[in-house]
Amino acid sequence: NNPEQQTDQFIENGSISKDMLTNNYDILYESTFALEQVSPFTVRLATAERTWYSYQTDSLSLLEAIIPSGENHRYTFNQTMNILFRHTKSLNLYLNNFEINGLESSSTPILINISAIDNSIRIQRFVPKFN
C-alpha cells in the first residue's frame, strides 16, 4: 500500500482534520462524565459499519484508521486518549470492558476525550455549520 493510495482511501471515507471540524462544524452538545476506571486503560472500538476515525493516545502522534465493518480495534494508554469519529452509526465504544454510553447513532462527527488527569470522559457531538 503506497501512501497516495492510503490518503485517497481516507478521503474517500470522510477524513476530517481539526481545521475542517472547526471551520465546517458547530458543537451541537457536550457531555462530561466522571472517569471511574484507573490506569492503564484499554479502549475497544466495535462497529457494524466501516468507520473512519483519528486518535491520539498519551503524548503520541495523531493517527488515522478505518475499522472495517464487523471488526474491533483496541488501544491501551495511561493518561489521555482523544478519538474523532466521522460518524457513530452502529458504533460501540468500551473502556476497560465497560461500554461508554451517550454515543447515539448519528451521521455527524463526534469527538471523545478520555482523561485520567481530569478524571473525565468528554463527548462532543458536531453538526454542519449553516452559512
Task: List PLM regions with ranges.
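Extended low-complexity, proline-rich intrinsically disordered regions
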Residues: 1-131
